[in-house]
Each structure stands twice: as C-alpha cells, then as structure tokens.
Design a protein with these regions (language model features):
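ATP/nucleoside-binding phosphotransfer catalytic cores, i.e., glycine-rich phosphate-binding loops
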Residues: 248, 252-326
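Accessory alpha-helical/coil subdomains and C-terminal extensions
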Residues: 2-5, 9-13, 33-44, 160-239, ...
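Internal gly/pro-rich beta-alpha loop/helix module
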Residues: 115-187
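ATP/NTP phosphate-donor binding region
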Residues: 1-78, 256, 276, 313
C-alpha cells in the first residue's frame, strides 16, 4: 500500500497542551510544537508520510481572521501540490466548528481536509489526542473523504463541518452533529462512511476574504432591553445574528429595534440559543426583512453571514436562499 503524503498544519489547542501533572484539571494549551508532536506520532507506525508546519500554538479561543487566512493560504497551496494527498489541521476544540465551517465554505473539495483536536492535554491520564490524530490520518488518507467538504474527527467519529458542534465542556464525547450526526465512524485501522459524498461541485462555494465584515451575535435573555442592540452595533456593523429563545424568538421592543437596524442596511439573521432545532421562516420575517438561520447555530450563522456579505450578497432573499442550502 502506498503511503499517503499528508500536510499537518498545527495551531495549538489541547491536543498540544500540557498540564505538568497527569491528574491536574488546569493546563496550558499549545505547548508542544508540531515537530515534537510528529515524533510521538512516528511511534504509532501510521501508514502515511506526514510533513508538519506550525501555523500557531495557542488556545482556539484566540484564533481569528489572521490564522484563518494563513490556514486558507497553506491549504490552497497544498491543493495545488500534486504530491500532497490531504491536509490535517490540529486545532483547539472551543472554536473548531467555526474554523471548519469557514474553510468548508471557501475551499474546493478536491482533497480531504480534516480538523482534529483533543479534550485532554498530552500528559493527562487517558489522553485522547494521539488516537484522534491517528483517526484523522486514516480519514485524510482515504480518497473517499474528498467531496465531503471539511471534516472534523473527534472520539472515533467523523463529522461534517456544517453539522459539527461542541456540546460539552469536558469528556472525550464532547462533539455531536446536527441536523446530521456523524457521517462516518473511524478507528486507526478502519473507516466506514455513512452515505456518498454530498458536495457535487469540486469548486469552492464562496471566495475567501481575509477581512470579514463586522457581525456580532446578540444573545436574547429574559428581560432584555431593546437598547442592547444599539449598544453592540456601530457604523461598521454589516450584519447581526440573534441567538433567540426557542425558535429564534425575541421581545417585541427588541424586534422593533432590529427592524430599524435592518432598514438602515444591517442584515439580521434569527438563530436559536438552543442546542438543536430548526429556525424556520415566519410570516413576520417577510415584513421585517429578517433571515431564518434554519439548522445553523449562532456562531455558524455568523460565519456564513460574514462570508455572504464579503462576497457582495446582502439582499435578504439571497441570504435566506444560502441559509436554506445548508
């Protein structure tokens, strides 16, 4: 069997974290460099040739536009390299779903791209990072992973970027998918896909822009005042995602303020603060010019809205059509 040539882009996170004790709860993410990490991986005897590149070595709470741009550039270059069969990105778990979704929207599907992380630091009892990484190698080495968009591998399961979400603060089973759960099951020695690849086109869905428009998330809570929306927006704000109660609901005074913002040119998307469930369009959305997030949670709705606005798509109907396709 020919070994796959895979590029490993390291950004830090718990998978490269160290606690200094096998029993401590607190730890420092991003302490192990990619070269040292791949030395540990060599002992596993994986059937792949791995080339590492350090993009950052930080917790994923600090990952944003600059690192997204570097990742996009490196992966684009890897796609143009005929000797590279796939890309693995080691990443902290806190914002992995946002990085994965942004890359999924703006990269072609010609080669596998897999994000992988860990819930326990490298020196903890029951460290899950090496197994997750071995699983990621298995997925990224499989030609059938192409055409499925960007994937996230955690806890012996493979998730699509558009579905994956972190649902627990602790435990190796912290990730789940919605509306689809796992799209595959993986171990270091086996991989089973659920269904055929779903990305019909090999091209990127949208162009990547290094500078994304300002789009805050407004979290709705009991007793929220209408003035909150005005306080969190400025002249630079291009869109706003509402993490509403229930099916994206909000008090009427706040809704009236958001209508005013919409009339001033700010795109408004209604999502839900609940972990699962669809936010469908309602008759009032037509009158208000709002967009329903459908299956996307607030953080992913924000990423999609930023990408759409950066690509010049600002009409509510066109934005809704893009959300309907998710």
């Amino acid at each position: 069997m020919t070994q796959a040539h895979l590029l490993v882009l390291a950004t830090g996170g718990t998978i490269a974290g160290v606690a200094g004790s096998a029993l401590r709860h607190d730890y420092r993410p991003g302490q192990i460099g990619v070269d040292d990490y791949l030395e540990q991986v060599d002992a596993l005897g994986l059937e792949a040739r791995l080339v590492g590149r350090q993009i950052a070595n930080i917790g994923s709470e600090d990952i944003g536009a600059a690192i997204w741009t570097r990742l996009h550039e490196e992966i684009t270059a890897a796609f143009a390299d005929p000797g590279c069969q796939g890309v693995i990105v080691t990443h902290g778990t806190d914002t992995a779903e946002e990085t994965a979704f942004l890359l999924d929207l703006t990269l072609p599907t010609t080669k596998p791209v897999v994000l992988v992380g860990a819930m326990r630091p490298a020196d903890a009892v029951g460290y899950d990072g090496l197994r997750n990484f071995a699983n990621a190698v298995r997925v990224a080495s499989d030609p059938e992973a192409a055409g499925r968009g960007v994937l996230v591998v955690m806890g012996d399961r493979v998730f699509a970027a558009r579905d994956v979400r972190k649902v627990r603060t602790r435990g190796t089973d912290a990730f789940r998918g919605f509306p689809r759960d796992a799209v595959g099951l993986v171990t270091p020695s086996a991989l089973d896909w659920f269904g055929a690849p779903w990305r019909a086109s090999e091209g990127a869905q949208y162009a990547y822009h290094a500078e994304l428009p300002e789009v805050p998330i407004l979290y709705v809570y009991g007793g929220i005042g209408a003035d909150v929306a005005a306080r969190m927006t400025s002249e630079a704000t291009r869109g706003l995602v509402v993490a509403g109660v229930g099916e994206g609901n909000m008090p009427q005074p706040l809704r009236a303020e958001l209508v005013r913002l919409r009339e001033s040119g700010v795109a408004i998307v209604r999502a839900s603060r609940l972990d699962e469930g669809l936010v469908d369009r309602e008759p009032e959305d037509d009158a208000n010019g709002f967009v329903a997030a459908r299956a996307l949670n607030p953080q992913k709705a924000r990423i999609l809205l930023q990408v759409l606005l950066a690509n010049g798509i600002d009409d509510p109907a066109a934005i809704q059509a893009a959300f309907d396709r998710r």
